[in-house]
């Protein structure tokens, strides 16, 4: 007898969460439809400043003569250090070696 009651109770069960979702959704939609935004008072319009275009920037003017400054600089000597005859570089393995035998 208990097997029959269990099978009958399963067939008559309803899903209450679906009904709950519809009620909540209905309340939410009705509150959205009834919403009316507040009117903006004219006082807030006075608080906003009018936008004006900024003035165009001007190029700076210097009193220095750049040509004479560049001519006064002269490249003197070699500034790149050279390696000694027996000294090896840690990046020597990156150099490509030429194959003496032709294919």
Swiss-Prot record:
GO biological process, one term: proton transmembrane transport
Record-linked InterPro entries: ATP_synth_F0_suH (IPR019711)
Cellular compartment(s): Mitochondrion; Mitochondrion inner membrane
Keyword Transmembrane: no
Chief subcellular location: mitochondrion
Cellular component, GO, one term: proton-transporting ATP synthase complex
Keywords from the UniProt entry: ATP synthesis, CF(0), Hydrogen ion transport, Ion transport, Membrane, Mitochondrion, Mitochondrion inner membrane, Transit peptide, Transport
UniProt key word Nucleotide-binding: no
Transit peptide endpoints, chain numbering: 1-26
Role according to the record: Mitochondrial membrane ATP synthase (F(1)F(0) ATP synthase or Complex V) produces ATP from ADP in the presence of a proton gradient across the membrane which is generated by electron transport complexes of the respiratory chain. F-type ATPases consist of two structural domains, F(1) - containing the extramembraneous catalytic core and F(0) - containing the membrane proton channel, linked together by a central stalk and a peripheral stalk. During catalysis, ATP synthesis in the catalytic domain of F(1) is coupled via a rotary mechanism of the central stalk subunits to proton translocation.
Subunit structure: F-type ATPases have 2 components, CF(1) - the catalytic core - and CF(0) - the membrane proton channel.
Family label: Belongs to the ATPase h subunit family.
Protein name, UniProt field: ATP synthase subunit H, mitochondrial
Organism: Schizosaccharomyces pombe (strain 972 / ATCC 24843)
């Amino acid at each position: 007898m208990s097997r029959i009651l269990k099978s009958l109770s399963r067939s008559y069960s309803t899903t209450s969460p679906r009904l709950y979702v519809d009620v909540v959704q209905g309340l939410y939609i009705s509150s959205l439809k009834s919403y009316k935004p507040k009117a903006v008072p004219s006082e807030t319009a006075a608080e906003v400043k009018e936008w004006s275009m900024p003035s165009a920037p001007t190029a700076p003017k210097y009193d220095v003569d750049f040509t004479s400054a560049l001519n006064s600089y002269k490249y003197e000597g070699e500034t790149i250090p050279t390696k000694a005859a027996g000294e090896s570089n840690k990046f020597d393995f990156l150099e490509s070696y030429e194959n003496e035998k032709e294919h």
